[in-house]
């Protein structure tokens, strides 16, 4: 897994992708920090939480080539026939993308140190927000990686990941567009109304953005961590199964 991780991590910086991604993140974080600090707020966790605004665009760039590029260049045949576990390949690629994503948050540590010189900071609020950002990134990377394993076109993988990111992050907003029947009469109408209400409530509670925003409340909830971690495990597993299917095809 270590060899795959190093190979993938270096590949991000052998092309402009890694540099452009970090430049965009650094610029956005710096801009947010200047605004928040300008208003006299010492809360760096707010800067971290603001990352959700661009994460839907950053992740597709990081994941669109993870699997599809190897498949297009036929490099995957070497990996699939080599004496190496498929799980090591997948985990190596996943952690490489996550490492590049995590590098983007290094400036927030500097921001936290700067603010600490002037005012008392809430380090726990910052750590909670950072944990949420890492978990959200891990979730979206795992989804993007799985999509990338299904096609040899980086463009298709990137576009699909972007669309799914928008849908999963903002399901709660979409749920508000669903008209919930009220004042229904009759058994079928009542049952249908209950189904719609339950579905809307489900979308609202499971939307990634809804869960992520809870990390900004300065309250640690193990259920939110487990929820995000479970999704990561699920899509990493699906990526492994996708590659294993091609190995034995």
Question: What are the residue ranges of the model-derived segments?
Answer:
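Secretory targeting signals
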Residues: 32-37, 41-54, 96-161, 169, ...
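Membrane-interfacial segments
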Residues: 37, 68-71, 75, 115-119, ...
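Helix-loop-helix units of permease transmembrane domains in multi-pass membrane transporters
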Residues: 66-96
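Alpha-helical transmembrane segments of integral membrane proteins, especially early/N-terminal helices
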Residues: 10-26, 89-97, 188-194
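Hydrophobic alpha-helical transmembrane segments
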Residues: 1-69, 110, 218-249
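A hydrophobic, multi-pass inner-membrane permease signature
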Residues: 59, 74-75, 93, 106, ...
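Helix-capping/transition residues at the boundaries of transmembrane alpha-helices
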Residues: 11, 79-81, 144, 148-149
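Terminal transmembrane helical anchor/hairpin motif
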Residues: 45, 158, 164-242
